[in-house]
């Protein structure tokens, strides 16, 4: 587990990933309740639970995604720190008005770069619902590859089990940020 003091602040242009602040939990819960998000996530946790996650009282590190200074969603990671494995997992959600504009792709890319370069991981996994095509496109743009379908992986909001798609990205597969590429 990463201590709350170790939580990064990552920025790239208009996008910022930062530790949570008082008041963020209510906004994140509202985003999780939006139809475009709740379709893929379980019932939102109470504000108190989200506050605990933002403080670091959980095994996952939950961070806030801001776009142009507005809370757009959450991104979290968990780490396997055993040197024999040294990998991390990521999850992300963005409010409906921030979806489909490249923000998710950039947030995942930014966090992946941090996990590889600053935390020393060699592999990152992400596990969207197999039917969540927009998320899969987003992760593919970052460089993630499908490695298998996990049948009846998680219970959806409708109460039935749904397949998950396991995707991973190795350290040397992360392409440079589009802003950093040289023309020529």
Where are these regions (language model features)?
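A short, well-structured alpha-helix characteristic of acyl/acetyltransferase catalytic modules
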Residues: 1-51, 172-184
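Glycine-rich phosphate/pyrophosphate-binding loop shared by adenosine-nucleotide-utilizing enzymes
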Residues: 15, 70-74, 162
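Acetyl-CoA-dependent GNAT
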Residues: 39-99, 114, 170-174, 178-184
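Conserved acetyl-CoA-binding loop-helix of GNAT-fold acetyltransferases
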Residues: 100-114, 136-141
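Short glycine/proline-centered loop/turn elements that form peptide/ligand docking sites
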Residues: 104, 108, 132-135, 152-157
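Conserved GNAT acetyl-CoA-binding A-motif
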Residues: 117-127
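Conserved catalytic-core motifs of GNAT/GCN5-like acyltransferases
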Residues: 125-128, 145-162
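Conserved active-site tyrosine of GNAT-family acetyltransferases
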Residues: 139, 144, 167
